[in-house]
Amino acid sequence: MANRRSLFSLSLIFVFMINSAIASPLTYNVASLGAKADGKTDSTKAFLSAWAKACASMNPGVIYVPAGTFFLRDVVFSGPCKNNAITFRIAGTLVAPSDYRVIGNAANWIFFHHVNGVTISGGILDGQGTALWACKACHGESCPSGATTLGFSDSNNIVVSGLASLNSQMFHIVINDFQNVQMQGVRVSRSGNSPNTDGIHVQMSSGVTILNSKIATGDDCVSIGPGTSNLWIEGVACGPGHGISIGSLGKEQEEAGVQNVTVKTVTFSGTQNGLRIKSWGRPSTGFARNILFQHATMVNVENPIVIDQHYCPDNKGCPGQVSGVQISDVTYEDIHGTSATEVAVKFDCSPKHPCREIKLEDVKLTYKNQAAESSCSHADGTTEGVVQPTSCL
C-alpha cells in the first residue's frame, strides 16, 4: 500500500511539473538575437526573429526589449500563433528611420495582424515624424502620406499598457477590426505642428476600453470611426488637439454605424473641439446612437459641444450638403468649464435626418466669465437640471 501511495504521489508531482513547465513563459531578449541599442543599427530582423520564436511556441512568451534605443524599419508581426499569450515588455525606445521617405508610403510602421492575446507593456515609440510634417507644410500632396506608428488589425484580446508614442508621421495608434482591447496609461505627444496625427483611432471594432491616458496631438485625441460599438473611454486628458470625435461618419454610401459609446471623466485643455460628432454632408446609411458624454471639463475649448453634419473638406462630393447619417440618443451630462468662442453648444444637424433624443443635463459652459450661447439646426431633445448656455433644443 505504501508503495502505491508513493507512486501516486510521484505521479502527481510529475504531472504538476509538466503543467508548470507548459505554463511558464519563455523569454526572448532581442539583444541576444542581434538587436543593437545604438539607435542606428537596423534591428528589424532581430525583432522578427523573437516574434517567430514566440509565435511558434506552445508556451506563453515574453519578447524583452532592454533599455536603449533600437532602430526599426516598417515591420509586421503576423499570426495566428500557437499560443495566445505573447507579451512585448519594452524597457527602451523604438525609433523609426529619420528619413521619412523610408517608411512614408507604408501604411504602418509597427503592425500586428491576425493575432490573439498580445500585450504591449511599457516603452517609447518614436515615429520621427517632424521632417514629414515640414514637408507637408511646404509641398503638400507631393510628400508621402506617412505611416501610422502602431497598427492592429483583425485581432482579439489585446492589452496596451504604459506605452508612449512620440512624433508619429500619421496616426499614433489605429485599432481596426478588433474584439476586446484594453489601452491603459497611454501617452501621446508631439513637438510642433503635426497634421493628421490622431492619437488613437478606433473603427470596425467592439469591446475597446481606453483608460487613464494623456494625449497631445495635431488632430483628434481619440477618433471613432464607422463600425465601432461598446467603446468605453475614461480618465483621458486631451490637449492640444481636436478633441474626442465620433467621425467623420458617412463618407461611404453603405457604412456601418457607431453605437454604445461612453466617454466619461475627461479633460480638454486648449483644444479645437471638446465632444464632437461629425458626418459628411452626403447620402449614407450610417448612424450614431446610444452615446453618453459624462463628467467632462473644458478649459478654453473652441467648440466644447458640437455636432457637425455638414463636414465636407474642399467642398467636393457633397451634393446639397445633406447628410444621411442618423444621430440619436446622445446624452451630455455634467459638462462644465470655459469656451474660447461665444457659441459653446452647437448642433448643426442634417435637414433630411434631424438629430433626435439629444439630452443636456447639468451643463455649465461660460465664455469670458459670461454666459455663452447655443445654436441649433434640425435638432430635437430635452434638458434637465441647470443648463448654461440656455438650451436651443
From Swiss-Prot:
A Pfam family it matches: Glyco_hydro_28
Residue positions the entry lists as glycosylated: N260
Molecular function via GO: polygalacturonase activity
TM region positions: none
Active site: D219 (proton donor), H242
Localization of this protein: Secreted; Secreted, Cell wall
SMART domains, A to Z: PbH1
Signal peptide: 1-23
Primary location recorded for the protein, binned into one broad class: secreted
EC code: 3.2.1.15
Broad EC category: hydrolase
Record-linked InterPro entries: Glyco_hydro_28, PbH1, Pectin_lyas_fold, Pectin_lyase_fold/virulence
Cysteine pairs bridged by disulfides in the record: C221-C238, C349-C355, C376-C392
GO BP term, example: cell wall organization
Catalytic activity reported: (1,4-alpha-D-galacturonosyl)n+m + H2O = (1,4-alpha-D-galacturonosyl)n + (1,4-alpha-D-galacturonosyl)m
Role according to the record: Acts in concert with the pectinesterase, in the ripening process. Is involved in cell wall metabolism, specifically in polyuronide degradation.
The family this protein is said to belong to: Belongs to the glycosyl hydrolase 28 family.
Annotated protein name in UniProt: Polygalacturonase
